[in-house]
């Protein structure tokens, strides 16, 4: 429709987003909570446009501290590809109770040797206090996540959105 519609959260897997407009041109915006307007990227009818999302931001997770805010610890020596204000999604395939989607990073702590802690840790605005058990998933990954907003130039139409590998 001619009003902005937004996708659910998408975990970033590649550096490029492909948008195909079917039957009518669309305006596209992306980010943590985007709204599409006539000032955004335009994709013409039956056109195909590739949009650069920037480098993929992802990191292994070695510890999760539960609470009204959630603290995520990364392996020593790796750092954090995330900054305050980024939105992230956690996938813990062996402990899915710890999974969360599209939560905001509220703090990044890069200070070493605070209480014997040497890795980078971040705080996320996710309330994990109701999650039971102790985190111990060696395959857990935190990824930057985003949403895509689309607005047609007139009437109704469809837009197909997918992450692709650009070569």
Residue ranges and their predicted role:
Residues 7-9, 48-54, 74-75:
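Exposed aromatic-hydrophobic patches
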Residues 55-167:
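Small/polar beta-strand repeat architecture
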Residues 36-55:
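Intrinsically disordered, low-complexity Pro/Gly/Ser/Thr-rich segments with frequent PxxP/GP/PP motifs
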Residues 12, 42-44, 65, 83:
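Residue-level recognition of short, solvent-exposed, well-ordered loop/turn junctions
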Residues 10-16, 67-69:
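Short coil/turn motif common to extracellular beta-sandwich-like domains
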Residues 12-14, 20-27, 77-83, 153-155:
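Short proline/glycine-enriched turn/loop motifs at strand-loop junctions of beta-rich domains
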Residues 20-40:
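Short, surface-exposed beta-strand/strand-loop-strand elements in extracellular ectodomains
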């Amino acid at each position: 429709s001619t009003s902005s519609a937004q996708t659910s959260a998408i975990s970033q897997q590649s550096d490029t987003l492909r948008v195909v407009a079917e039957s009518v041109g669309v305006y596209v915006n992306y980010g943590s909570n985007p709204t599409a307007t006539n000032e955004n990227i335009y994709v013409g009818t039956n056109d195909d446009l590739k949009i650069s999302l920037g480098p993929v931001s992802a990191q292994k997770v070695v510890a999760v501290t539960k609470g009204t805010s959630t603290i995520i610890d990364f392996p020593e020596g790796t750092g954090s590809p995330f900054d305050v204000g980024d939105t992230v999604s956690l996938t813990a395939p062996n402990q899915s109770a710890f999974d969360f989607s599209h939560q905001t990073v509220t703090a990044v702590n890069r200070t070493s040797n605070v209480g014997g802690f040497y890795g980078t840790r971040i705080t996320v605005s996710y309330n994990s206090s109701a999650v039971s058990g102790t985190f111990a998933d060696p395959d857990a990954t935190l990824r930057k996540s985003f949403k895509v907003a689309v607005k047609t130039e007139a009437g109704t139409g469809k837009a197909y959105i997918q992450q692709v590998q650009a070569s």
